[in-house]
């Protein structure tokens, strides 16, 4: 009987040790980087660069090419997303829209339009929580719930890009979301544009879009911003004049795969 107890105890200890070995840190990290200067790519630092690379996340495109990738966070609708879509259609630019459950449920017609016009719909979670406070099952539920609602509208099940709510994440969150098949997309260009009661005018948004531009830039823009909606047309026009081209996150992923060494 004693030997059976010993074996059981040993098994429990081994299982516990394996679980500890597999555990990863869950301390919250706020995404950030040293902002672009003189149109050079920004740098998130050695530690962050190493962490996100480990889990196939990214915040830059090909920094050797004057390419820009436009991404938008859609937590709720403030009346400006249609104008943003009009501008993208005019310039034949494909955007990636990271949507919450609230946005999808509240604005099915805009989700349908995004899909019909060839844009990418990314996942911004259902309730916009700090994912570091959630269990693995809760994280999956947050993301699956968005996908299910989008599928009801578009009939598509290709929502594989994720942007962590509030830009807060951890190694644990990166690990779990990668396990679920997501690629986490951060950003290299951003500014304070989400305060709807403190909009600063078209010039403010335009200046940031131009000043922070750099090769391989991934822009984060909030569609609740009147400033962004008013500045986007001129910004795209003038960035093209500066030699920039606009590509989609799908284009970037295809190029990354093409650059991988063959086995």
UniProtKB/Swiss-Prot annotation:
GO biological process: carbohydrate metabolic process; cell wall organization; sporulation resulting in formation of a cellular spore
Reported pH dependence: Optimum pH is 7.0.
Oxidoreductase is among the record's keywords: no
Binding site for a divalent metal cation: 124, 128
NCBIfam families xref list: spore_pdaA
Known function: Catalyzes the deacetylation of N-acetylmuramic acid (MurNAc) residues in glycan strands of peptidoglycan, leading to the formation of muramic delta-lactam residues in spore cortex, after transpeptidation of deacetylated muramic acid residues. PdaA probably carries out both deacetylation and lactam ring formation and requires the product of CwlD activity on peptidoglycan as a substrate. Is required for germination. Cannot use chitin oligomer (hexa-N-acetylchitohexaose) as a substrate.
Protein name: Peptidoglycan-N-acetylmuramic acid deacetylase PdaA
Source organism (scientific name): Bacillus subtilis (strain 168)
Gene of this entry: pdaA
């Amino acid at each position: 009987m004693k030997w059976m107890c010993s074996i059981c105890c040993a098994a429990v200890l081994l299982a516990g040790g394996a679980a500890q070995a597999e555990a990863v840190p869950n301390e919250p990290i706020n995404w950030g980087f040293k902002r672009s200067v003189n149109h050079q790519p920004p740098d998130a630092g050695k530690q962050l660069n190493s962490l996100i690379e480990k889990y196939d996340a990214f915040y830059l495109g090909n920094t050797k090419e004057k390419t820009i990738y436009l991404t938008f966070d859609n937590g709720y609708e403030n009346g400006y997303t249609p104008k943003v879509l009009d501008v993208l259609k005019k310039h034949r630019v494909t955007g990636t829209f990271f949507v919450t459950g609230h946005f999808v449920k509240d604005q099915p017609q805009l989700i349908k339009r995004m899909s019909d016009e060839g844009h990418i719909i990314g996942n911004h979670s259902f309730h916009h929580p700090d994912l570091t406070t959630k269990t693995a099952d809760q994280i999956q539920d947050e993301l699956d719930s968005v996908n299910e609602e989008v599928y009801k509208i578009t009939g598509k099940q290709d929502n594989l890009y994720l942007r962590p709510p509030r830009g807060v994440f951890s190694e644990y969150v990166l690990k779990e979301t990668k396990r679920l098949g997501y690629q986490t997309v951060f950003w290299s260009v951003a500014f304070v544009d989400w305060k709807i009661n403190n909009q600063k005018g078209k010039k403010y948004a335009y200046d940031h879009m131009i000043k922070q531009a750099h090769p391989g830039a991934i822009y984060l823009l909030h569609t609740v911003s009147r400033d962004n909606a008013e500045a986007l047309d001129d910004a795209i026009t003038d960035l093209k004049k500066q030699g920039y081209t606009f590509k989609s996150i799908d284009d970037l992923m295809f190029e990354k795969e093409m650059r991988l060494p063959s086995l």
